[in-house]
Design a protein with these regions (language model features):
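Basic, polyanion-binding surface patches
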Residues: 23-194
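N-terminal amphipathic/basic-hydrophobic helices that include classical n-h-c signal peptides
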Residues: 1-26
Length: 194
């Protein structure tokens, strides 16, 4: 008979019983004021990366992103995320009023790599990345995240070549004219892992 044991991930305690079953005790989140996040947002997004997710129980997709911003707009905390129309996540961003920004711990960099290199059109990215979706009234976030921001879409606009003051950016990043769409999401709820 196998011995019982346990292991701890960044978001859950897994208890293996003597009969081969596994019980999962999820760690909880606490609601926080988004203005209390003291981390450098340039590092949080540009180096640590974020997982942008939109959808619901009926279907969702997420993508790894390292371009964006977390700041203050219209007197409210807000995220600025950029999604190309060619991305599967774009369909969900367009058809939903909310999206989430998930910040995973460094120990889950593998999940970010998977979500940034595979398409949800071709596979179940959450399963492939070992991520556990949690559903709210407005969308989806992941149990493995250390920070979650649930954002209500307030503004969106396609980027255009003519709007760039620095034309070298168009040459460098948009030679194929595959411009991003910018979404400004007002943070309606922020959660931190306990």
């Amino acid at each position: 008979m196998p011995a019982a044991g346990f292991r701890l991930s960044s978001r859950a305690l897994f208890v293996d019983n003597a009969f081969g079953g596994v019980k999962i005790f999820r760690m909880k989140f606490e609601k926080i004021d988004p203005k209390s996040v003291a981390e450098n947002s340039a590092k949080l997004i540009g180096s640590d990366w974020m997982l942008v997710c939109a959808g619901d129980r009926g279907g969702f997709n997420m993508m790894t992103a390292s371009w964006g911003a977390f700041g203050f707009m219209w007197n409210m905390p807000a995220f600025f995320v950029f999604v190309r129309p060619s991305r599967y996540t774009y369909e969900f961003m367009e058809s939903r009023d909310f999206f989430t920004v998930n910040i995973l711990p460094e120990s889950r960099r593998d999940a970010l790599n998977i979500c940034g290199s595979r398409s949800g059109r071709d596979c179940d990215k959450a399963a492939a990345a070992g991520l556990t979706p949690e559903f709210t009234e407005n969308g989806v976030y992941f149990a493995e995240a250390r920070l979650v921001f649930e954002c209500r879409k307030a503004y969106s606009q396609m980027m255009e070549a003519g709007s760039f003051a620095d034309k070298t950016l168009v040459e460098k990043w948009y030679a194929a004219s595959d411009f991003h769409k910018m979404y400004v999401g007002v943070v309606e709820r922020a959660l931190a892992a306990k």
